[in-house]
A protein has these predicted regions:
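C-terminal tails and terminal domains of large nucleic-acid-associated
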Residues: 446-482
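Short glycine-rich phosphate-binding loop at a beta-alpha junction
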Residues: 18-19, 314, 474-476
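Conserved beta-strand scaffold positions in the cores of enzyme catalytic domains, especially
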Residues: 44-46, 118-120, 254, 282, ...
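Broad gene-expression machinery/nucleic-acid interaction feature
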Residues: 58, 73-75, 219, 391-395, ...
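Conserved hydrophobic residues forming the short capping helix/wall of the S-adenosyl-L-methionine
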Residues: 33, 330, 465
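Hard-cation-handling environments
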Residues: 127-257, 261-430, 434-446, 454
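His/Asp/Glu-rich metal-coordinating catalytic cores
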Residues: 1-215, 233-247, 266-270
């Protein structure tokens, strides 16, 4: 998925090391590195399920077949001088996966019988009881939507959910529909998956998005990005009537095959509302089971713990409350609470034959990418941007005599995102009066330091504006010398 490989090009610019990846992930990473002109300088080694890789004298990594929402998902059994560490990666226990490749539970059990020192397990759905539904169950729901539909069908899902796309492909073939693809990430993913053989379909099934006007509605399926209501995504632009290629009409059935990620609920609701106002029929997870999670719920997590029988348990991949819930599940499975270790990003865990203990911390956290800049946008810059977005900006421009300290011209007031100057002339006049008053006070106190004058103007003007408007714009005084 993008959240796993998106940072690879930026990481490689700092540390150029070999990449080990399953075939599909390797293909997607190659595409990404090619965009960044890093492909020739990077070594990518494709790995296979069941393979064991030797790393130096003391370590080896066994690749164990897993199941998730993307093909080629794996767990890693890392053999060290003090024992084996099993890392689940993202997983669910799906007994009817779309590609027929069931998780290798037998190998996990074998390793458990041999002795697993530590289990690091996916905690995303640790708060949810029961089992996660199989990916194939979504296909059954889709079939019921497709079978009698005479409308054009638009399906929004995560670009990397290849199993979901395969099910849409199967139904398009079954019901005689062509498929067009919208959204750059979706196009790239499907092209790569088809090229590598992860999507099985007739050669002529997919058509260019420019060709949709030559087919009747009942002959078309459009697969698109935008299931999270992202502002510039294809589905959002369709819902707003801004998409250049696709115009939504009342003769469309739109299926949003994803649950909103926490924080995206308002964006998704807005897209659904916009689509419904156009008159389109909209089906989403609150109305039908058109999405299932790719992560294990409590009973699947218990199964892995039971098979692995680890000495130490380390819940990973989740918010702290989810790590806590997973830790509680491990306690219920009989793991000693002293051997359950909750870690935060950057903490170092040292394990030897006798004990496991948290030691020091290393630098970790977000590295923000802003245009061509990587890591040069910090908390102060983000705070300023948030401030500007909420209350706007006022710039005070003064020209002062460098010898006498007298105001030669101004003050002039420039406002952006605070008030419309022409409609707030009285307030602008008051602002100028406050600035003149503060400058005069500085003159009387014989303050000639520009930094002090700016600070005085800024602080007093800030108090005045808040008193008058209950808003707190960013204030930037600019003093020019003559």
């Amino acid at each position: 998925h993008e959240d796993h490989i998106g940072g690879v090009p930026y990481f490689l610019k700092q540390i150029n090391i070999p990449i080990y990846a399953p075939r599909l992930a390797a293909g997607l990473i190659r595409n990404k590195l090619e965009e960044h002109k890093l492909l020739r300088s990077t070594t990518i080694i494709e790995i296979m399920q069941g393979q064991t890789i030797k790393l130096g004298k003391y370590f080896s990594v066994e690749i164990i077949r897993s199941t998730h929402s993307i093909p080629d998902s794996v767990m890693l059994a890392i053999t060290t001088p003090v024992g084996t560490i099993l890392h689940t990666g993202d997983f669910k226990v799906d007994f009817t996966p779309i590609d027929g490749k069931i998780m290798d539970l037998g190998r996990i059990a074998e390793l458990g019988n041999q002795g697993i020192l530590a289990l690091m397990s996916d905690s995303t759905n640790a708060e949810r009881k029961g089992f996660t539904m199989s990916e194939s169950s979504v296909g059954d729901v889709f079939d019921k939507l497709f079978i009698h539909c005479t409308k054009r069908i638009v399906v929004a899902t995560f670009a990397s959910n290849v199993h979901r796309v395969q099910q849409i492909v199967n139904l398009a073939v079954k019901y005689g529909r062509k498929i067009a693809v919208c959204g750059r990430s979706m196009v790239n993913m499907i092209d790569t998956a088809r090229e590598l053989g992860y999507i099985d379909c007739p050669e002529d099934l997919f058509i260019d998005i420019d060709m949709i006007g030559t087919y009747n509605d009942e002959q078309l399926v459009i697969i698109t990005t935008g299931s999270q209501g992202e502002p510039m995504s294809a589905l959002t632009r369709m819902a707003a009537g801004d998409h250049r290629k696709v115009t939504i009409t009342p003769n469309d059935l739109v299926i949003i095959s994803a649950n909103p990620i926490p924080g995206n609920e308002k964006f998704v609701s807005k897209v659904v509302d916009d689509l419904m106002q156009i008159g389109a029929e909209v089906v989403y997870s609150a109305l039908a089971d058109v999405h299932v999670s790719g992560h294990a719920c409590q009973e699947e997590q218990k199964l892995i713990i039971a098979l692995a029988k680890p000495k130490y348990f380390i819940p990973v991949h989740g918010e702290y409350r989810q790590l806590m819930a997973h830790a509680e599940t491990a306690k219920q499975m009989g793991i000693d609470g002293k051997n359950i270790i909750l870690m935060s990003n950057g903490r170092v865990l040292e394990i030897n034959e006798e004990e496991a203990k948290l030691t020091t911390s290393v630098q970790s956290g977000k590295v923000l990418v802003d245009g061509l800049g990587v890591g040069d946008v910090g908390n102060i810059v983000l705070r300023d941007r948030q401030h500007l977005s909420q209350d706007g900006l006022i710039i005070i421009v003064l020209t002062m005599d460098s010898n006498t300290g007298e105001v030669v011209a101004g003050p002039d007031v420039i406002s952006r995102g605070f008030v419309y100057v022409r409609e707030s002339e009285n307030l602008m006049d008051d602002v100028k009066s406050v600035v003149r008053h503060e400058i005069k006070k500085c003159e009387e106190r014989d303050i000639r330091d520009w930094a002090t004058i700016k600070s005085t103007v800024r602080e007093n003007l800030k108090d005045y504006i808040f008193m008058k408007t209950k808003r707190n714009p960013m204030i930037i005084p600019i003093i020019m010398e003559v």
